Amino acid sequence: MKTVTMKVTGLVQGVGFRWTTQMIAQDLGITGTVKNNPDGSVSIVAQGEELPLEHFIKKIKASPSVAGHVDHVDLNTVSDAEKFTRFSVVY
């Protein structure tokens, strides 16, 4: 099990980004959270097996929302992370 954090910038708020991110995560068996940040970016914590997590990251970089676009993803691996049981949108 691997955990990553992502800070995603671009047109990622107000375009269904969090909802589509949650749908992709659930389809791939990824757990974690997604939330909007005050600076207009989106933060994601994603946890899963290596291959599904790689697919998830690729989909995020390609922008899961057709109405938005991703300019940059700051990706970090986390050790000793909290264990998630589902993927949820944090408000």
Swiss-Prot record:
E.C. numbers? 3.6.1.7
Could you tell me the keywords of this UniProt record?
Answer: Hydrolase
Q: Which leading EC class covers this enzyme?
A: hydrolase
The Acylphosphatase-like domain sits at 3-91
SUPFAM superfamilies noted in UniProt: Acylphosphatase/BLUF domain-like (SSF54975)
Read off the PROSITE patterns from this record: ACYLPHOSPHATASE_1 (PS00150), ACYLPHOSPHATASE_3 (PS51160)
Q: Give the domain of life.
A: Bacteria
**Catalytic activity line of the entry:** an acyl phosphate + H2O = a carboxylate + phosphate + H(+)
Q: Does the keyword Transferase apply?
A: no
Active site residues of this protein? 18, 36
Q: Name one Pfam family in it.
A: Acylphosphatase
Indicate the transmembrane segments per the record. none
Molecular function terms in GO for this entry? acylphosphatase activity
Family to which the UniProt record says this protein belongs:
Belongs to the acylphosphatase family.
Official protein name in the record: Acylphosphatase
Species source reads Lactobacillus gasseri (strain ATCC 33323 / DSM 20243 / BCRC 14619 / CIP 102991 / JCM 1131 / KCTC 3163 / NCIMB 11718 / NCTC 13722 / AM63)
Q: What is the lineage of its organism?
A: Bacteria, Bacillati, Bacillota, Bacilli, Lactobacillales
User: In the UniProt record, what gene is named as encoding this protein?
Assistant: acyP
